[in-house]
């Protein structure tokens, strides 16, 4: 670019620049443009230091007071609620919504006592893993799924009913019935042994024996009979006897033992409600009832009993049987026992054993509501008689 002189004529290139009287050169700044005649310079000069270094101004450092702000709990709670709502909205949309999630928690004592694990450092230095902290990788044990056959086998085992596995049904020896006198039941008082243990005296300081003149008296012992010695030893043996659990015997064995022993024993025999036999004859009279008719006259109507009532009266019970022999007991070779009542056969089986005392008592009541009770004996065994359906069907077809 060529610059003009004060007269406005262009100067030759390389010529000397004219010096202005009012201008002063500043280091690092370009000279102001020459003043043209007829135009005044602007009051506010333009900032021509665009490419230069700005002048630094001093500003004092004021230390601000720090105020500890309390954590805002409400904001965090609101944020958590918003996040939960978003997660619920995400889970509720799309396929597979409502899937159960497994939350696995871990602690520092979950793996139990174990040796301290050591990890090698960069410079062959052992570092304890306890300082590092528990690992966040947890091995979740996968449960083995059962197959259809295994589940069916478990159901079969649960549905079994061919065994008794209830410890409460077993008879306890401590709950045995008490029978008087105690010699029959086996529970007797424990007698202390009268024989004293003779211990040798320890050797102590010698004492002077006192001389006492005692008259020497000798008693002649007579020899005892063997029967007396056996009687003396018998109660001691009976006192040490402890009753055992009742033995499970069949009906055939029980009847054989009763036939061989000389002692008499009472048996509890359970029979059906209706027994084969001739019911007692009763005069059936019709029931007369008086009914008032519309005309005001009394009419007598005869009513007969229903069929069910007549059948109930025609049944034979144990009270209707006559005294004496009722039936016969048959013991088969197989061990099966049957009771024959006329043409009807009843199967005889053992009843459930009771762990409490059962006694047969005869009660006699008088006219003045007073009476006597007599204990006839102790009942140990129970027999149940049930009808044999095979013989009933055979008799029906004939």
UniProtKB/Swiss-Prot annotation:
Similarity annotation: Belongs to the eukaryotic RPC4/POLR3D RNA polymerase subunit family.
Sequence segments annotated as region (Disordered): 1-105
Claim: Acetylation is one of the keywords in the record: yes
Pfam families: RNA_pol_Rpc4 (PF05132)
Residues bearing PTM Phosphoserine: 42
Functional summary from the UniProt entry: DNA-dependent RNA polymerase catalyzes the transcription of DNA into RNA using the four ribonucleoside triphosphates as substrates. Specific peripheric component of RNA polymerase III (Pol III) which synthesizes small non-coding RNAs including 5S rRNA, snRNAs, tRNAs and miRNAs from at least 500 distinct genomic loci. Enables recruitment of Pol III at transcription initiation site and drives transcription initiation from both type 2 and type 3 DNA promoters. Required for efficient transcription termination and reinitiation.
InterPro entries assigned: RPC4 (IPR007811)
Assembly behavior: Component of the RNA polymerase III complex consisting of 17 subunits: a ten-subunit horseshoe-shaped catalytic core composed of POLR3A/RPC1, POLR3B/RPC2, POLR1C/RPAC1, POLR1D/RPAC2, POLR3K/RPC10, POLR2E/RPABC1, POLR2F/RPABC2, POLR2H/RPABC3, POLR2K/RPABC4 and POLR2L/RPABC5; a mobile stalk composed of two subunits POLR3H/RPC8 and CRCP/RPC9, protruding from the core and functioning primarily in transcription initiation; and additional subunits homologous to general transcription factors of the RNA polymerase II machinery, POLR3C/RPC3-POLR3F/RPC6-POLR3G/RPC7 heterotrimer required for transcription initiation and POLR3D/RPC4-POLR3E/RPC5 heterodimer involved in both transcription initiation and termination.
Modified positions (Omega-N-methylarginine) in chain numbering: 95, 97, 99
Keywords: Acetylation, Antiviral defense, DNA-directed RNA polymerase, Immunity, Innate immunity, Isopeptide bond, Methylation, Nucleus, Phosphoprotein, Transcription, Ubl conjugation
Modified residues (N-acetylserine): 2
Coiled-coil regions listed: none
Intracellular or extracellular location(s): Nucleus
Main location group: nucleus
PTM (free text): Sumoylation on Lys-141 can serve as a signal to mark misfolded Pol III for proteasomal degradation.
Domain of life: Eukaryota
GO molecular function, one term: DNA binding
Keyword Ion transport: no
Record protein name field: DNA-directed RNA polymerase III subunit RPC4
One GO cellular component term noted in the UniProt record for this chain: RNA polymerase III complex
Cross-link annotation Glycyl lysine isopeptide (Lys-Gly) (interchain with G-Cter in SUMO2), location: 68, 78, 141, 152, 160, 190, 199, 206, 220, 285, 302
UniProt GO BP: defense response to virus; innate immune response; positive regulation of innate immune response; positive regulation of interferon-beta production; tRNA transcription by RNA polymerase III
Ranges of biased composition (kind: Basic and acidic residues): 66-100
């Amino acid at each position: 670019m060529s610059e003009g002189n004060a007269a406005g004529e262009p100067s030759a290139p390389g010529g000397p620049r004219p010096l202005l009287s009012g201008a002063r050169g500043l280091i690092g700044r370009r000279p102001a443009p020459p003043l043209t005649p007829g135009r005044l310079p602007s009051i506010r000069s333009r900032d021509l230091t665009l490419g230069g270094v700005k002048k630094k101004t001093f500003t004092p450092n004021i230390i601000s007071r720090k105020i500890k702000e309390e954590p805002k709990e409400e904001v965090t709670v609101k944020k958590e609620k918003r996040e939960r709502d978003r997660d619920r909205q995400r889970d509720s949309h799309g396929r597979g919504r409502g899937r159960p999630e497994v939350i696995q928690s871990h602690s520092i004592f979950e793996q139990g006592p174990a040796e301290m694990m050591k990890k090698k450092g960069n410079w062959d230095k052992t570092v304890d893993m306890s300082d590092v902290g528990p690992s966040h990788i947890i091995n979740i044990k996968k449960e083995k799924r059962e197959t259809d056959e295994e589940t069916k086998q478990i159901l079969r085992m649960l549905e079994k009913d061919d065994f008794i596995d209830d410890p409460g049904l077993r008879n306890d020896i401590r709950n045995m019935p008490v029978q008087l006198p105690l010699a029959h039941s086996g529970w007797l008082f424990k007698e202390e042994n009268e024989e004293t243990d003779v211990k040798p005296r320890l050797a102590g300081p010698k004492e002077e024996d006192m001389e006492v003149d005692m008259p020497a008296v000798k008693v002649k012992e007579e020899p005892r009979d063997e029967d007396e010695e056996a009687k003396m030893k018998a109660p001691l043996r009976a006192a040490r006897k402890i009753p055992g659990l009742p033995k499970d015997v069949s009906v055939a064995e029980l009847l054989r033992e009763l036939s061989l022993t000389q002692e008499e024993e009472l048996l509890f025999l359970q029979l059906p409600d209706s027994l084969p036999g001739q019911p007692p004859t009763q005069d059936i009279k019709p029931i007369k009832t008086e009914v008032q008719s519309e005309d005001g006259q009394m009419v007598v109507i005869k009513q007969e009993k229903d069929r069910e009532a007549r059948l109930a009266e025609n049944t034979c019970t144990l009270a209707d049987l006559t005294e004496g022999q009722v039936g016969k007991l048959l013991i088969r070779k197989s061990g099966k026992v049957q009771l024959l009542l006329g043409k009807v056969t009843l199967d005889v089986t053992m009843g459930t054993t009771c762990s409490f005392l059962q006694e047969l008592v005869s009660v006699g009541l008088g006219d003045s509501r007073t009476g006597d009770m007599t204990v006839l004996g102790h009942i140990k065994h129970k027999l149940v008689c049930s009808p044999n359906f095979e013989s009933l069907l055979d008799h029906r077809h004939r």
